Design a protein with these regions (language model features):
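Signature of dsDNA virion morphogenesis modules
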Residues: 1-223
Length: 223
């Protein structure tokens, strides 16, 4: 199970009350922990590096928990108040603890968590590097392809250097088999110069195309 209820200690309440304007007690909150993601290769042929998990452990503290990656104030369910990277049989897991205020509005989601209906979670973050497991180069720049075998080694993409962590969501279909995670990892804009160059090239192409039509060259070419 990827989400499970946890007891709330005095130390937990001290962390939780950092995010609350009203002083809360253990009776006021429902606390649970989640396996957010791990270092195993997922169904997309990607894997977080152990370094990335530790970076996310720092960044996700204080982040909100929503559903289906729909960012709105009304869609906020819980807030993460502590995290931990756990070693587990040769791979690493990012564990997060979150709390939900016990209110009439939140009673339904608490029931769904308690009964195991809502238990898969998803992380949304941005990463700086996507590294090929075969050659160690930037994955988008090399010729290797995910899931293909090269000299007996299956290619996958390692996600590394997490730049920001946005939120954790409850989802229906997981990508990571063990952790039950559907991830959304946008590439951080570290290739801004290259992107700007491509934009310039596209603008120049459109400018030339406009001139081509204005001069009637297109018509002459058809004739």
């Amino acid at each position: 199970m990827n989400v499970e209820k946890t007891a709330v200690s005095a130390d937990d309440m001290a962390l939780i009350n950092q995010y609350s304007r009203a002083e809360l007690s253990a009776d006021d909150v429902y606390s649970f922990k989640m396996v957010c993601c791990d270092s195993k290769i997922d169904r997309d042929g990607e894997a977080f590096s152990v370094n990335a998990l530790h970076e996310m452990a720092k960044l996700f503290v204080g982040r909100t928990v929503i559903t289906d990656h729909k960012p709105s104030a009304k869609n906020q369910i819980a807030r993460i108040y502590k995290t931990h990277v756990k070693e587990n049989n040769g791979f690493s897991q990012l564990i997060a603890w979150a709390y939900i205020p016990k209110t009439d509005t939140n009673s339904d989601i608490i029931t769904l968590i308690e009964t195991g209906i809502v238990k898969e979670v998803s992380v949304s973050c941005s990463v700086r590097k996507r590294i090929c497991s075969i050659c160690g180069e930037a994955f988008d720049a090399c010729h290797h392809r995910k899931f293909k075998d090269y000299d007996g080694k299956t290619c996958y993409c390692t996600l590394d250097e997490v730049m920001d962590a946005y939120e954790v969501s409850f989802v229906a279909i997981p990508a990571q088999r063990g952790a039950g995670v559907t991830k959304q990892c946008a590439m951080y804009n570290v290739q801004c110069a290259d992107i700007e160059l491509k934009i310039k090239m596209a603008e120049n192409f459109l400018f030339c195309l406009d001139n081509f039509y204005d001069k009637g060259d297109f018509k002459n070419e058809i004739e």
